[in-house]
Every structure is written in C-alpha cells, then in structure tokens.
Amino acid sequence: MGDAGSVAPVRRQRARQIARFAAIGTGATVAATAATGGVLLGQARQARRTIPMAQAPPPRCDGVYGAKLPGPPVTMVILGDSSAAGYGVHRRRETPGSLLATGLSRRLHRPVRLHRFAVVGSLSSGLKPQVESALEVEPDVAVILVGGNDVTNRTPFPVAVRYLVDAVRTLRAAGCEVVVGTCPDLGTIRPIQPPLRWLARRWSRQLAAAQTVAVVEAGGRTVSLGDMLGPRFAAEPGRMFAWDRFHPSAEGYAIAAAALLPTVLSALGAVPERRPVLPGVEGVRSLPEAAHQAARHAGTEVSGAQLRGRDRGPGGRWAQLRRRAFFGVGAVPPTGSAADSATLEGTA
C-alpha cells in the first residue's frame, strides 16, 4: 500500500510544480513575449512563497462503515492523489473516502469496507502500484481522483491519460466498477494569479475532457468536478479551501463527495434520484460531444451507451449523459455518525 502520509516535502514539491507550470505557460504560446514569460515566472515565485508548509498527513479512513447493517460488505477502494487521500482535513470523517463510504452504506443499507490507497503527490503514472494493492482486496468499486499533479508537473496529456486508462482497464478486467472524478479546476487556486491562473484553468479543462473520453472508452464512468466545483471554490475560497489555500477544506471535500456518490451508486446497480432534465443536456450522443457537454454542465455523469443496438456511430462510441441528484453526504457527518463509528482494521 502506498503511504498517503508522506507529506513532509509537500511545500518544496508544490513549489517545483508551480515553477514547472509557469514554464508550461511560457512555452505554450510561441508568440508570447519575453516580458509575458517573466510575469508568469514571477507569479510562480509569489505562489511558492504563499503556500504554507505541510503540517500533517491526511487521517486514515480505512475500515468498515455501517458494520451493524445486514448483508455482506461492499468493498470500495479510493485511488489517486492528495485530493483522494483527503489532504487538508484533520478528521477521518471529513475525508472523501469516509464521506463516500458513509453515504454508500446509508443508501444501500449494507456495510461498506473502505480501503484507501491514494498517495499524496501522486501522478497518473503512480496509479499502477495503487491498483495492484487494490486488487488484493477484491474491490467492488473504485473511485479515482487524479490529474492535478499531472498538470503542474507538465506530464503530456496523452501520457497521463494512458496511465489512467491502464488503471481503469485493469480494474474492470477484475470485475471492479470504476468512477473517475476528472481533473479539478486549478484556476480557482488563489496563490496562482492571472495570467498563470488562466492557463491553469485551460489545461485543467483540457485534461478533464481527455480523461472523460478515455475512461468511458475503457469501461468506466466519469463525473466532471472541475466545472462544478470551480465557481463555488472561486466565490468562497475561505470556506472551500483548506489552510494551505491549495487543497479543499472539509466542506469542499463534502461537495465533491456529494457529486460522486450518485454515480458510485449507479455503478453498483442502485438507481439514484435524478435532478430535473435540462433540455439538450441529457441523452445519448457521441463520446467526444458528451465530454464537451459534461464540461459545460456541472456534475454530469458520462458512461458508455448503445443506440439501436450499436456501441458506436459515425462520431465514435456512444455515451449517455445523466444528471444525478446530489445526496445529503454533502453535509459533514456529526460526531458519532457512521463515519466516526467505522471499525478500523489495522490502520494508524
């Protein structure tokens, strides 16, 4: 299992990432002037000075949730980077894994066994060892949150997507359902100032769209988080971001979990509630068009579909767009809830 608590060099790592990201902006537009490049590099240096030192690793959240409920437990694994590990919060019940396991247990009325293999600072290339560890526990469903570090580390998008696809295919081949929360909107991070912030937003959305197409092709489902969380995080940064102004706060993670939970339920065969239909948003269309629509309409689920008995049409694979109702998991559970009473199994 990867050690999600290895965060001592987080500030230095984040500083290098921001500097590299500034280099992306400097080289991404050939016509950019040297002065523009200097502005970007200056903004990167300012962001490095603003982001504080790491204080503690994210709390462990492994265990059985709803242990007293009837039936065999559903096994869920959480893979990805610091956003999957829950970096930025201090209580187990505030982590995305705990929020999802609690909500899943309540909706299914069954125990949920949670294993977190996410690693702080992980790139998409780090998913392979996480998947290998996850397969040992025979998961029913995997939730993957990854992509932000690929943007800041200048990972070529085709390379990052290939690693993600390999992870999804391996899990699906083992009979595990897969839900991917696509790349977050890095343009909401306050220590990053315009024009570097604009580049961050553009690259985040490009990677999220590429992830959507590739994951659905590989048999998984996606939920667009960037375009949903971006406006809320930009409007209320004091509430949505943690103390480091880079990672989500407890409330930020709760909103993300509320968006992911309906799709996790659907992947497991449950039928979650749906929000009112938006004309022109829901329905079956080509996968590239579906990815574009999902980016424009927050919280939209994208999954594979058939049309007239065919998986593919002139525009490629068919995809289904759905809008799910956000469940009450968005509220951080109070002390004494199922999240706090989870049976821990050998966790630190």
Residue ranges and their predicted role:
Residues G2-A35, V39-Q43, I255-A348:
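Conserved catalytic region of serine esterases and O-acyltransferases that act on ester linkages
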Residues P184-G187:
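Short "lid" loop at the C-terminus of a central beta-strand within the Rossmann-like core
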Residues G42-A118, E138:
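Serine-esterase "nucleophile elbow" of acetyl-processing enzymes
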Residues S249:
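Short, conserved phosphate/pyrophosphate- and ester-handling motifs at nucleotide-, phospho-/glycolipid
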Residues A174-C176:
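A short helix->loop->beta-strand "cap" motif at the edges of active sites that frequently abuts
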Residues I189-S224:
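Substrate-gating cap/lid alpha-helix
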Residues S124-V161:
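Oxyanion-hole/transition-state-stabilizing segment in secreted/luminal serine hydrolases
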Residues I78, I144, V179-V180:
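Structural beta-sheet core signal
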